[in-house]
Design a protein with these regions (language model features):
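Conserved, function-defining core regions and hallmark residues within catalytic/recognition domains
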Residues: 23
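EAL-family c-di-GMP phosphodiesterase catalytic domain
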Residues: 9-13, 65-72, 92-104, 120-256
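Short beta-alpha junctions and helix-cap segments that line functional grooves
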Residues: 20, 108-111, 133-134
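Catalytic core of bacterial c-di-GMP phosphodiesterases, primarily the EAL and HD-GYP domains
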Residues: 1-8, 13, 32-107, 183
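A conserved signal-transducing helical linker
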Residues: 27-31
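Surface-exposed amphipathic alpha-helices with a cationic face
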Residues: 48-52, 83, 109-119, 166-173, ...
Length: 256
């Protein structure tokens, strides 16, 4: 199964790209993050439908902010949209930061359950430690956990449980959760992960992030007689921008 991760980007009045880490906190303070999440969800569904015309075995990871879960009005809009597109639930994975997922209040937990009841699955990213309770996560609908490869391989990582990082994939698998090693940027990392039984990887090594075409835009033109492709700027999205952040590679090594 090929999957894409969407990352939102904004443009300022000088047409400069603003990364999520630079605007999310401001958007949350201004009460705009829910609107951004809603727009990104719509874009994810548009692209997912486009991809599924050619390949049904495809999936998309879509980030959702904790503030969106906490705001009943904003969440209601998102839920209505996801309800209308619940046929895509098996292919649309909603992603939350580890720190946010650990600190969900009553309202957020109820909203999360509403999404799970409609068939949506969840992913955890921005993992900073391996204090993971697979049973609890599985009960809440988590089916993927993205752990930085460096964290898995760090010999100085303090033991957070009785299980070694090399056994984490097997432990999660018992509860129906797939471990994804992310931020893989070199072949050496792939080799080092072979003993960890990691079935999925994400990172620049597999595919760098790239902008998506606006909905309805024609595909990029073929190279001309001189072998030159059209300028990349012709393929850029208007704000907010979503980028595919490395297709997940099935099996880090082994026969294809």
């Amino acid at each position: 199964m090929a999957t894409l991760r969407f990352v939102e980007r904004l443009r300022d009045d000088k047409d400069q790209i603003i990364a999520a880490e630079d605007f999310v906190a401001i958007a949350e303070t201004a009460g705009l993050i829910g609107r951004i999440d809603h727009m990104v969800m719509m874009r994810c569904v548009q692209v997912l439908r486009r991809l599924m015309v050619r390949n049904k075995d495809v999936g998309v990871f879509c980030n959702v902010a904790a503030a969106t879960l906490a705001n009943s009005s904003t969440f209601s809009q998102c839920l209505d949209f996801l309800e209308a597109n619940r046929a895509l639930a098996p292919s649309l994975v909603l992603e939350f930061k580890q720190a946010n997922f650990r600190n969900l209040g009553t309202t957020e937990s109820e909203h999360l359950a509403a999404l799970s009841q409609r068939g949506y699955r969840f992913s955890i990213d921005h993992v900073s430690d391996l204090r993971i309770d697979p049973r609890e996560l599985a009960d809440r609908g988590v089916r993927f956990i993205k752990v930085p490869a460096a964290l898995l391989l760090d010999p100085k990582q303090p033991p957070a449980s009785d299980i070694h990082p090399s056994d984490l994939s097997d432990l999660l698998g018992r509860f129906g959760i797939d471990l994804i090693a992310e931020r893989i940027e070199g072949e050496r990392t792939v080799v080092d992960l072979l003993d960890y039984d990691v079935r999925f990887g994400q990172g620049f090594l597999f595919a760098p992030p790239r902008p998506l075409r606006p909905e309805g835009a024609p595909p990029p033109a073929a190279p001309d007689a001189n072998g030159k492709a059209p300028p990349a700027e012709e393929q850029l999205d208007p704000p907010p921008r979503a980028t595919g952040n490395a297709a997940l590679a099935r099996r880090l090594a082994g026969p294809t």
